[in-house]
Amino acid sequence: MLVLVLGDLHIPHRCNSLPAKFKKLLVPGKIQHILCTGNLCTKESYDYLKTLAGDVHIVRGDFDENLNYPEQKVVTVGQFKIGLIHGHQVIPWGDMASLALLQRQFDVDILISGHTHKFEAFEHENKFYINPGSATGAYNALETNIIPSFVLMDIQASTVVTYVYQLIGDDVKVERIEYKKP
């Protein structure tokens, strides 16, 4: 089961669109679920995600116009409970102790957060944490040189094989990270 994890698009305010090389990789009919950390910013970005998969879950980012997106969400995909937040609630941004507290409050196997615009994936206390980064490479308040990235999770029973796609220069680099539920 393929799950697309992305966020912080900031279209059209900080970027015009997803990189063309990412659009070629993201084709309708291959992905079953989309988990978005927010900051889509427009209905057009949401509509695009709906063309890729029927099951789209989005949380509200600090720049989203749609106030109907929830602040947080917990979804179950296969054997995994997955928590989804934008990440602007985590102070300081990306702080491990704050993320671990949210993971325990949500009682999830995987916590997905964004806001920093930088990809991260790691295990902590037998739980898995993912920040997909910014799919467009949009700048954040602290940095202008952001590497565009998104994540595909391939969920198979009690294992998640995570593929991070990063656009470095003109090349899409792919890294594989595996997490097994204890």
UniProtKB/Swiss-Prot annotation:
The reported result of mutating L152E is: Impairs interaction with TBC1D5. Impairs interaction with VPS35L
Question: Which Pfam families has this protein been placed in?
Answer: Metallophos_2
The annotated consequence of I91D reads: Impairs interaction with VPS35. Impairs interaction with VPS35L and CCC complex association
Q: What is the effect of changing H117A?
A: Loss of in vitro protein phosphatase activity
InterPro entries listed in its UniProt record: Calcineurin-like_PHP_lpxH, Metallo-depent_PP-like, Phosphodiesterase_MJ0936/Vps29, Vps29
Q: Which residues carry this modification: N6-acetyllysine?
A: K50
| Impact upon substituting D8A | Loss of in vitro protein phosphatase activity
Q: Where does the chain bind Zn(2+) 1?
A: D8, H10, N39, H117
According to its UniProt record, which protein family does this protein belong to? Belongs to the VPS29 family.
- What is the protein's given name? Vacuolar protein sorting-associated protein 29
Source gene? VPS29
